[in-house]
Amino acid sequence: MFGLFKGKKKEPKSPADEAPVDDTAATAPDAVAEQDEQPRLEAGLEKTRSRMGAGLRALFGGRALDDELLEQIEEELLLADTGIDATQSILDTLRREAKRAKTASEVRDILRRTLIDMLVPRESEPPEPPPGQPWVMLVVGVNGSGKTTTIGKLAQRLQAAGHSVALAAGDTFRAAAVEQLQQWGERVGVPVIAQKTGSDSAAVIHDALAHARSRGIEIVLADTAGRLHTQSNLMEELRKVRRVIARFDETAPHETLLVLDGGSGQNALVQARQFGAAVDVTGLAITKLDGTAKGGIAFAIVQETGLPIRFIGVGEKPEDLRPFEPEAFVDALLGQDTGAAVGSGSRG
Ligand SMILES: Nc1nc2c(ncn2[C@@H]2O[C@H](COP(=O)(O)OP(=O)(O)OP(=O)(O)O)[C@@H](O)[C@H]2O)c(=O)[nH]1
Ligand SMILES: [Mg+2]
């Protein structure tokens, strides 16, 4: 479930509470929930899947890998914003393996493995807070990328899983930003620590941390104003927010999550570079993948930044914000295994 929150589970209040909170044991209710999740993920990624997958599915359906098909696959991957480097390594794998493999299903398995490996980050161990201190996530990104919505959805999922959460209304810049977060707080039933628009973002977030510590709240999700790297005053504000959080607890923030709009394509790469340079981003959320055929950006971005994708947004509902799992993501893009033999299908 929330791999990110592993080891952060609340002690079960009673044995009956244990099953929904435990994300390591494969209990029966969890297994049922997972069965429903793959079709949901596939539906959310439908646009990307149709753009990047036709050539690949023809190959897996038994069509021989000739130059024409290779070109089609290359074009589809690039159109889905998979990026030149990631696309080339996918094509290299195909050229190499399609010769050796006896069945289309073998080619598929090898490509599947290659794609999954591409999504595995160069990750270092995330820090943990000292006992009695909240786990802190600072959420950053450009305007409208989905920061506040992602926080709301995460709060809902965490709350449902038995965690205690507080939200920090660190977007003190945009009018109505505080209200938007407060609405989420009310909806989910978690406290929102806020001051009025125009106040100091770092001070609001500091208040939220103090509130969480004094009440034994486990997790603080801190919203920030959307900003571009060119707005140097706002980028400096983010650095200050980080310094203030670190003064509260030197291990914090335990995650600095950069929220990227999946539809922004190659721009997302630029944002990852710029925010990474300014505030030491430790994880990514890619939102709005349901509305775009450019979901190949996930490969490009992990390849380039080495950062882990923590969550993806594939729809408007809270359950459409999903912890990112490379296997499930790749399976949703590639579709079902047909098991056909290489070259046995008609070329039409
Ligand atoms: N379809 C879809 N819409 C999303 C997703 N995530 C966010 N949105 C929508 O994107 C819009 C912007 O989301 P916000 O959460 O307000 O974005 P923000 O980054 O906080 O924006 P600023 O605070 O202005 O910087 C809202 O209409 C959300 O409903 C997603 O995964 N899928
Ligand atoms: Mg916002």
Features from the language model and the residues they span:
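Non-catalytic terminal/linker segments enriched in charged/polar, low-complexity residues
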Residues: 1-118, 122-125, 132-133, 138, ...
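P-loop/Walker A NTP-binding module and the surrounding RecA-like catalytic core of P-loop NTPases
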Residues: 85, 113-348
